Structures are given as structure tokens and as C-alpha cells.
Curated annotation (Swiss-Prot):
Pfam families: Acetyltransf_1. This is N-acetyltransferase family 8 member 2. It is an enzyme of class 2 (transferase). InterPro entries: Acyl_CoA_acyltransferase (IPR016181), GNAT_dom (IPR000182), NAT_camello-type (IPR050769). GO terms for biological process: gastrulation with mouth forming second; negative regulation of cell adhesion. It is a multi-pass membrane protein. SUPFAM superfamilies: Acyl-CoA N-acyltransferases (Nat).
Length: 238
């Protein structure tokens, strides 16, 4: 089993963290396309239109060409959307991770294996939490595709949970995309509860891309739950 350790972010990690984030977002494009193809209006355009073309013109070539161009346009739309989101993020909190996260109340960690950064996650306090709540929000969870399925993502989430619990927060909240099925399964398996869902724009609604909200209620510091240091070192679970 490969060894790993989770540590606080350092400036030397910046380039690798940006690479992890960018590659992780690009990997979602095929899943986003598949999800959109299940929507009623997509079923009308594909395969509805090709069938109509064949019935009206008896041309399978024309129908095939239409299908190819339709899928190509979908890919371009999602690629541009992904590129814009990545560019916006790189100009926001990821532009200066130290300034954005490493303050008195937030933090950012990386998972390192064999002197290579293979995962990351951040946490910041929620600015305007519900009355009576003190919430920490989990951000930017990502693990290299070559190191998934080994428990690294779970270890990173546990790091955030322990960090928030040690500081007396009542909940850890997060948002994730509707096409990020593996992330959703991980959060729910760890005890997060889905609390909401919304679309950031009309165009995203047409694409079927929603944002899912999750919350994890933390036990009191003296009660049962996660314990021990949140920065830990050990073998990666199989």
C-alpha cells in the first residue's frame, strides 16, 4: 500500500493544486453531456431530429452528419462553460490560496504521496450562517485520477470535519455539482445530508446542471465522533 500524509498547503504547492483543479473540472465534461442527453428537449433533438431527417429525406448520411454536429456543439458548449468556470476560479480564491484560506479561521490542505501532491481540500467559515448555527464550508475537494479509490478523498473530508469540530463549529456544509456522482456518494456515505438544490442560471437549468447542497452536523467536542489529530500520516486504505 502506498503511504500518504495530509499537510497544510504551502506556496510551493500552488502550481500542482491548480493542475489538480483544472484537470478535475475537465473530467466532468463527458458526464455533463450524458446527463444533458437524458433531458426531454435533448431527446427531441437527438434522436428525434435524425429520425425525422431519415423519414423525410431517406438520407442516413444527413442524419448521421446532424448527430455528429449536434454532439460536437454540445461538447463545445460544455468545454467553454468549464473553461470559463476554471478561469473565474483561478482569479478568485485559487489565485492566492494563502490569503483566501490560511487565516485565523480557515485552512487548506493537500494530500501528498511519494513527494507528489495528489489531493486537496479547503475550508472557510460561512459568512452568514442560519441563526444559532456556526458553520464551516468545505471547498475544492479534488483527488488525482490516478489516486482515486484509495481513501484519500475520505481522509481529506475527515480532516475538514475534525478541523471544524476542534474549533467548535456546529456543521460542515458544502456544494457540489449534479454530475459529480462519485463525490455525492462519498459525502452521503460519510453521513452528509442533502439539504437543497438550485440552478445558478437559466442556461445551466437548460443543461440540467444543478448545484446540490449538503450538511454534516458535528458532535460536541466532548461527545462521540471524530477524534485525534486531523493532520495524520499512514497507509492509504484499500
Amino acid at each position: 500500500m502506498a503511504a500518504y500524509h495530509i499537510r497544510q498547503y504551502q506556496e510551493k504547492d500552488h502550481k500542482r493544486v491548480l493542475e489538480l483543479f483544472s484537470s478535475g473540472m475537465k473530467e466532468l465534461i463527458p458526464a455533463a453531456i450524458r446527463q444533458m442527453l437524458t433531458l426531454p428537449h435533448s431527446l427531441l433533438l437527438l434522436p428525434g431530429v435524425p429520425v425525422t431527417i431519415v423519414l423525410m429525406s431517406a438520407s442516413w448520411l444527413l442524419a448521421t452528419l446532424y448527430s455528429f454536429l449536434f454532439l460536437l456543439c454540445l461538447w463545445l458548449i460544455f468545454w467553454i462553460s468549464c473553461r470559463n468556470y476554471v478561469a473565474k476560479s483561478l482569479q478568485a480564491d485559487l489565485a492566492d490560496i494563502t490569503k483566501s484560506y490560511l487565516n485565523a479561521h480557515g485552512s487548506f490542505w493537500v494530500a501528498e504521496s511519494g513527494d507528489q501532491v495528489v489531493g486537496m481540500v479547503g475550508a472557510q467559515p460561512v459568512k452568514d450562517p442560519p441563526l444559532g448555527k456556526k458553520q464551516m464550508q468545505l471547498f475544492r475537494l479534488s483527488v488525482s485520477s490516478q489516486h482515486r479509490g484509495q481513501g484519500i478523498a475520505k481522509a481529506l473530508v475527515r480532516t475538514v470535519l475534525q478541523f471544524a469540530r476542534d474549533q467548535g463549529y456546529s456543521d460542515v456544509v458544502l456544494e457540489t455539482g449534479s454530475v459529480q456522482h462519485s463525490a455525492q456518494a462519498l459525502y452521503q456515505a460519510m453521513g452528509f445530508q442533502k439539504t437543497g438544490q438550485y440552478f445558478v442560471s437559466i442556461s445551466k437549468k437548460l443543461m440540467g446542471l444543478s448545484i446540490l447542497q449538503f450538511s454534516y452536523s458535528l458532535p460536541f467536542a466532548s461527545g462521540p465522533g471524530y477524534s485525534g489529530k486531523y493532520l495524520k500520516k499512514g497507509p492509504i486504505p484499500c
